[in-house]
């Protein structure tokens, strides 16, 4: 009972702190750097990480196995993984973290919702999960999901900012064209100079935006590369585990199939990044597609309850 109380306490404290941290992140995006907010932000992140870590440790001690046996535990570990990945761009550019931070509160909030009430009770592992490969395979896959989701979010942000820039530039050019059709030459020259001056000012104002686009592209590539490495290790370790448990390295189980699709999507992303002739928007589109594919891979099998991996979403009741 005391373990469950501490687990419940750590869960809700971490969720509350993450909510405050994201609010501070959003404030720092609008307002210039404030020392007090930066200090609170750093302390909040450390405290959140400590609470989630304490929750996982308590769950591990109480259950007697690494807490990755069901969907609830994997969501908590995914939230913890989000925090780890979130810290990588934090030390370089704190504003990038405001894009990836909501992933932590989303998974944390979803895990603490009433949907997983029964799963919060630790249960006996099914025979297939009673293996040393549980920690290796599942932890690598969850870390991969966290890294790939964070990198994909950065790519989505890149597309949004780029799209806004294109609309603004198109509006300036269209205005100049319309003016040239309805005014005389002298007025046209004056209007052109005004518009060009405005465009120059517009470029100066949005110089930060272009810098942010470059940073988003660079960090999304780095984080996705890290996630791709974790995903490859997770798939390989899962194949070895499958051979020990079921006598075959690969069975084209729905989970395995979607994991392969995910791996292929991000392999295409990395291949596009090696081509210097292609714009960053091309790879960002692929990463955005990968964002949806990951959620299908992660939740699809568990919620539908199909395939050999579906046991992770159900409770084993002892008789």
Curated annotation (Swiss-Prot):
GO terms for biological process: cytochrome complex assembly. Keywords: Chloroplast, Cytochrome c-type biogenesis, Membrane, Plastid, Thylakoid, Transmembrane, Transmembrane helix. Belongs to the CcmF/CycK/Ccl1/NrfE/CcsA family. Required during biogenesis of c-type cytochromes (cytochrome c6 and cytochrome f) at the step of heme attachment. HAMAP family: CytC_CcsA. One of its GO terms (cellular component) is plasma membrane. GO terms for molecular function: heme binding. It is found in: Plastid, Chloroplast thylakoid membrane. This is Cytochrome c biogenesis protein CcsA. Signal peptide: none annotated. It is a multi-pass membrane protein.
